[in-house]
Structure formats: C-alpha cells, structure tokens
A protein has these predicted regions:
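Bacterial N-terminal signal peptides that target proteins for export
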Residues: 2-17
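Secondary-structure end/capping motifs
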Residues: 231-309
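Pocket-lining segment of extracytoplasmic ligand-binding domains
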Residues: 94, 126, 175-264
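Short, glycine-/small- and polar/acidic-enriched structural segments
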Residues: 33-162, 168-180, 187-193, 208-211, ...
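Extracytoplasmic/secreted envelope proteins and their assembly/folding machinery
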Residues: 47, 78, 117, 131, ...
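Conserved C-terminal helix/tail region of periplasmic/extracytoplasmic solute-binding proteins
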Residues: 302-327
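Sec/Tat signal peptide C-region and signal peptidase I cleavage site
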Residues: 26-31
Length: 327
C-alpha cells in the first residue's frame, strides 16, 4: 500500500511540474512589462490612446503594463525624461528641440499631423470679434517654448504682425487658463478646441481661431522615448508603437465607442467629445512616420521659439527603426 501511495505521489508531483512549465510558457502568464508614459496634457484627445488601449486590452495583448501621468506642458515633460521618471512622453513637435539641447531622448514616432484639434478661444464679453482684433492682445499658453506658444506666434507671423504681434502669458494646465479667461485676466486662451467648444456650450466664450486652418505641414504631436529605455528595452519600444497603431485603428473604426471612452479621460460631455472626434481624428497618423515637409516646418519653429539658434539637422532628432515594417 505504501509503495502504491508513493508511486501515486511521484506521478502527481511530475504532473504538477509539467503544468507549471506549461503555465510559464503561456503568453499572459508572465507579468506584463512596465512602461511609464508622460502626457504633456492629461486630457488631450490625441493622448487618449493610452487609456483606450488599456480599456480595450490592447496593451495587454502586447504584454505591456502602461502607466501614465499628465504634465502641464512640454517643458515639464522634458524635465521628467531628464529625471528618468518616465520612459515615453507624448508631447509636441516643437518639443523635439529640447533633444538638441541635451535631453537624453529620441523621437520615435510622429503621431499627429496638422493641428486640427487646437484653437484660440475668447470670452463671451471679449471685445475681440475678428482675427484683426487679436493684434496686441494677451492670450494664455501652457508654457514658453510649447506647441501652444508656437501656434500663436505662427498665426501672428502669418497675419503680418511678426511673431510677437500677440502677447502671451504661460499659465500651465487648462483649468488655470479657463479661470484666467473668465476673470478677464487674458483676452484669449490657446488650448485644445474642445475647451472652446465647452465654453460655447456654457455661454462663456467661443473658438475664434482653428489652427488647423492655418498650419498644414506639421507634426503637432510626437512620441519620445528616453535613450536609456531604447537601449535597454528596444523590444518594448517596438511593442508600444505597434500597440499604438492598433489603438488608432480601433478608434477610427469604432466612432461611437471611442467617443464614450474618451469622455472618461477628458471629462467633457458626449456632444462636445463627438465634435472633437470628428475634427481631430483625421490628424492622427496611421503609420507614425515622419513627413519631410512637416520636419522642415518644425526645424523653423525651433529657431522661432528660440529653443535653438539655428535650424538643426532633424535626422539627428528622430528615428523610424522601431516602427513596424511597411508591407
């Protein structure tokens, strides 16, 4: 009897060992690889793929555990990369200039093209009724050297007023800018157009300038990765970008569900989010690749923002080596 029990025990032990090996070899049984992602703004539509990918299980499909945190503009985002507190950052095209100044990162994807989702909004009692009324006015931006800062200067330049024809003040996150507008401390705010749509709905203001009508060749948003991360975890970079492309594909094919999911991030009403989806979805890149004309405009913007004294060789600031191979 004892011999039979011992034999049975050994069989059970062997079976358990086999099951353990099978479990370890099964995708999903292993702990997902952590990636830390910073957003220049926590609620921006173009950055919502992080949250949608998590909700739909797309990051899990690529064995990634994606954590994200919002920052108040590009400058703070770049500081986080220097401090090695994030692996990826979702920022603006002009933010590429900080790489030439020593931020230890590389641009790995161009995720949004012309700034279809960016606007300049004015208050309900504002004396500013037309483009020409903006000359000499003071508007808020997130930070100096940011996308919002450049858009104002570029619009002013196109109007023939020079880059400083519209005055700017840096106020950080969107709530602070909206509060300043309502208090009359600024004559306009440069944010995502959805903030302007919200002001319109509440009777507090309106969108005056849609920057996508004035800036055509551009990379509004890009994805950065720290040099340390691309060196130590190149496979995670590839998986993250492949997952991002899949999320964008989902968003394009599932309009109604995407709108509902984005409202959880933006905290905007569904009607406003619908308006933003229809406006902004076309600017989101399906292949994440860089466009020569857009890079030329970015190079010029870095000089105009006084981030760099001369236009850089943009090829030194980005790479496409981690993007999926074209079919």
């Amino acid at each position: 009897m004892n011999t039979a029990r011992k034999a049975f025990g050994r069989q059970c032990l062997r079976a358990a060992s086999v099951l353990a090996i099978v479990a370890l070899a099964t995708p999903g049984a292993l702990a997902a690889d952590l990636v830390r992602v910073g957003k220049a703004s926590a609620t921006t539509f173009a950055f919502a793929p992080i949250d949608i990918g998590k909700e739909k299980g797309i990051w899990a499909k690529y064995n990634l555990d994606v954590e994200s945190i919002g920052f108040g503009g590009d400058a703070r985002l770049q500081q986080a990369m220097v401090a090695d507190s994030i692996d990826f950052s979702l920022g603006s095209g002009p933010g590429m200039g900080f790489l030439a100044k020593g931020v230890p990162a590389v641009t790995v994807a161009a995720m949004a093209n012309e700034p279809l989702a960016m606007g300049l909004s004015v208050g309900k009692n504002s004396p500013i009724k037309s483009y020409d009324d903006l000359k000499g006015a003071t508007v808020s931006v997130s930070t100096g050297g940011s996308l919002t800062f450049w858009l104002v200067r570029e619009f002013s330049r196109q109007r023939g007023w020079g880059p400083a024809g519209i005055k700017t003040v840096s106020l950080g996150v969107n709530p602070a800018q909206v509060a300043a507008l309502k208090a009359g401390n600024v004559q306009g705010i440069v944010t995502s157009s959805s903030i302007g749509y919200m002001l319109e709905k509440n009777g507090d203001g309106r969108v005056l300038v849609e920057f996508g009508d004035h800036v055509k060749d551009f990379h509004t948003h890009v994805i950065f990765a720290t040099k340390k991360f691309v060196t130590t975890h190149p496979d995670r970079v590839k998986r993250f970008l492949a997952g991002w492309i899949e999320v964008i594909d989902f968003m394009a094919k599932n309009r109604e569900e995407t709108i509902k999911l984005v409202t959880l991030v933006s905290q905007l009403s569904e009607d406003i989010q619908t308006r933003e989806y229809d406006k902004a979805m076309p600017m989101l890149s399906r292949d994440l690749r860089f466009r020569p004309k857009a890079l030329d405009v970015l190079a010029r913007s870095l000089v105009e923002l006084e981030i760099l004294p001369t236009a850089p060789d943009m090829k030194t600031l980005y790479t496409e080596e981690f993007l999926p191979v074209r079919n």
